[in-house]
Amino acid sequence: MTVLHSVDFFPSGKAPVAIEPRLPQAAFPEHHHDFHEIVIVEHGTGIHVFNGQPYTISGGTVCFVRDHDRHLYEHTDNLCLTNVLWRSPDAFQFLAGLDQLLPQEQDGYYPSHWRVNQSVLQQVRQLVGLMERAGDSMDAPAVANREILFMQLLVLLRRSSLMEGATNNDAKLNQLMAWLEEHFAEEVCWEAVAEQFSLSLRTLHRQLKQHTGLTPQRYLNRLRLIKARHLLRHSDHSVTEIAYRCGFGDSNHFSTLFRREFNWSPRDIRQGRDAIIQ
């Protein structure tokens, strides 16, 4: 597995934070780093496989990667990221207690992926721009200024995350997408889902298409197919059982959609043929 080292990304041996744009981010094999990373998705879509679990990401997704996490990107479509790299909590001169602003693992579950709305994403861009222009001077006021900007970014993300329960349409869509991530295998009635999240059906269609480039049903199908591919690689369930587990009522229809999405049949993935080619 590829290991990325801080010496290749940070401007000096003491700098606690670095900005690394990926415009766009191509598919990238599994790796980990000796530093922490906040991944901010500007726009586009892709699959983020985080510690072996696949997540669909799009504009407004924010992922918190720790120095022992492993991850990769695949199936990317104009996926543009800004990576805010930071060494460790004890690398800062003026900041303490950062863990209170970051997602925390509880009972083996780490809420690594948050979502923010488009207006917050614009504020994030402005803060990141200030961080990029802050320079590399190591005198105390300059260091303090850069650390303050990093703290402001964490506060903004924390306040604006899904967990804060905002009520505008962007926030409602974020909540809906998080719900789909958990309930993808269930039968979905879009009229009922729209009502559940206090959105009109037309607004749901329009906003999901703007965020992901896909209609709601195509987005749901892709989500199901991603989960199915993960099970094909990492479980012993039959293709038919996986199809049903991921919300498909007919295994032949599942196989057709799967090949159309990934250019491989479920059997090819089960036998690891895609990995051999790569």
Swiss-Prot record:
Any matching Pfam family: AraC_binding
| Function as written in the Swiss-Prot or TrEMBL entry | Activates expression of the rhaBAD and rhaT operons.
Q: Does the keyword Cell wall biogenesis/degradation apply?
A: no
Assembly description: Binds DNA as a dimer.
Q: Does the keyword Transcription apply?
A: yes
Q: Site described as Interaction with sigma-70, positions? A: E241, D250
Q: Which SMART domains match?
A: HTH_ARAC
DNA-binding region as annotated in the record? 191-212, 239-262
Under the heading Gene3D superfamilies, the entry gives: Homeodomain-like, Jelly Rolls
Stretches assigned to the HTH araC/xylS-type domain:
174-272
Its gene is: rhaS
* GO terms (BP aspect): positive regulation of DNA-templated transcription; rhamnose metabolic process
Task: Kindly list the places in or outside the cell where this protein is found, as annotated in its UniProt entry.
Answer: Cytoplasm
Single GO MF descriptor: sequence-specific DNA binding
**CDD domains recorded:** cupin_RhaR_RhaS-like_N
Residue intervals passing through the bilayer: none
- Keywords assigned: Activator, Cytoplasm, DNA-binding, Repeat, Rhamnose metabolism, Transcription, Transcription regulation
Annotated protein name in UniProt:
HTH-type transcriptional activator RhaS
Question: A single GO CC term, please?
Answer: cytoplasm
